[in-house]
UniProtKB/Swiss-Prot annotation:
Organism from which the protein derives: Xanthomonas campestris pv. campestris (strain ATCC 33913 / DSM 3586 / NCPPB 528 / LMG 568 / P 25)
Protein's UniProt keywords contain Magnesium: yes
Reactions catalysed according to its record: 5-phospho-beta-D-ribosylamine + glycine + ATP = N(1)-(5-phospho-beta-D-ribosyl)glycinamide + ADP + phosphate + H(+)
Top enzyme category: ligase
The protein's name in its UniProt record: Phosphoribosylamine--glycine ligase
Cofactor requirement: Mg(2+); Mn(2+)
Span of domain ATP-grasp: 109-316
Amino acid sequence: MKILVIGSGGREHALAWKIAQSARVSEVLVAPGNAGTATEAKCRNVAIKVDDLDGLLALAQREAVALTVVGPEVPLVLGVVDRFHAAGLRIFGPTAKAAQLEGSKAFAKDFLARHGIPTAYYAVHTEVDAALAYVREKGAPIVVKADGLAAGKGVIVAMTLGEAEDAVRDMLSGNAFGDAGARVVIEEFLDGEEASFISMVDGTHALPMATSQDHKRVGDGDTGPNTGGMGAYSPAPVVTPEVHARVMREVVEPTVQGMIADGVPFTGFLYAGLMIDAHGAPKVIEFNVRFGDPETQPVMLRLQSDLVDLVEAAIDGTLDAAQAQWDPRPSLGVVIAAKPYPETPVTGEVITGLDAVPASAKVFHAGTALNAEGQVISAGGRVLCVAALGDSVLDAQRTAYAGLQPIQWASAFQRSDIGWRAIARERDAQA
């Protein structure tokens, strides 16, 4: 069978790589893909943009694609699933209506409140003066979010009142995130530890994937501005078996049932970005309606089951009878980005050393392309993710960082401390 993966990032390379391992799959088409998927076994890139729904549908029909997996949020919010369903094609992802869980922060917060799912207090504002008054009433620290899609970067954690006021003015005067900031969601600053809790959902049932923890800030020690994510590891030790049970009971299952009650059943990857407090109580920071990036890379490294079997079970509504098998070892992925990301990065630089990466590490491509000479060049902010398994998080970290040593280009940089929280936990446990 032929499978289509929509997208061009590290997440899509990891999904395509995993799908290609299925004995049932003859070829994986990736639209538009990157330099990594161009050379991955059984994979072929097709130059169709993720927002070209007509082109994607025509491709799936022309190539007799059996199954489509959607990577990024943009085509989901645009309604790619609705279009494929209307044409009678099998596709894994939420409808445009269900994708509003990510497409609109206000929709998500209203949904959480309506269904009694734990989250931060919040208010939605469109007027600068009212928003400023609310911020002054609540005080800092406080979180200001652009309402629409902002590629994971439309969130300001304001530690002072001045920062909060600046963020409100920026977003509501339309100069920070374009249309996405025409409404802002202002919410409580939550204390605790973050975790990414991703489940596969078939409309009625949820099958949890391995947990993970992302590193949003650009700099070591979680400093500097927010990014799409600078690295991740799996599992997230903050999600103990007890916390896992609470998340399923208090967040995931009520979300699946709430979407049914609201008449928009959810099928796809449901990503709950959580804050776990000192007592193990989860609160939802955000929903995404797709797998995380860079969490997909270390999580796929640990998945031992056939991903195609799981996706088919989800489309058929039989996830309650499915099981996912995981490598018990932790995995860790380090993103190599291009300076001055998250500002507009330098692109078009030739990347060397990819063929010298040891077999103990796996390189997933994100913002890469092939130039006319067939050389791999940088083509985005987050360029590569080097991931590895290990007997401990420290071991996985060492292997991943050793794996990225040979890789070079002029503007490359990465954090040197991915996994630090889990490694500190391991050290404490041994003390």
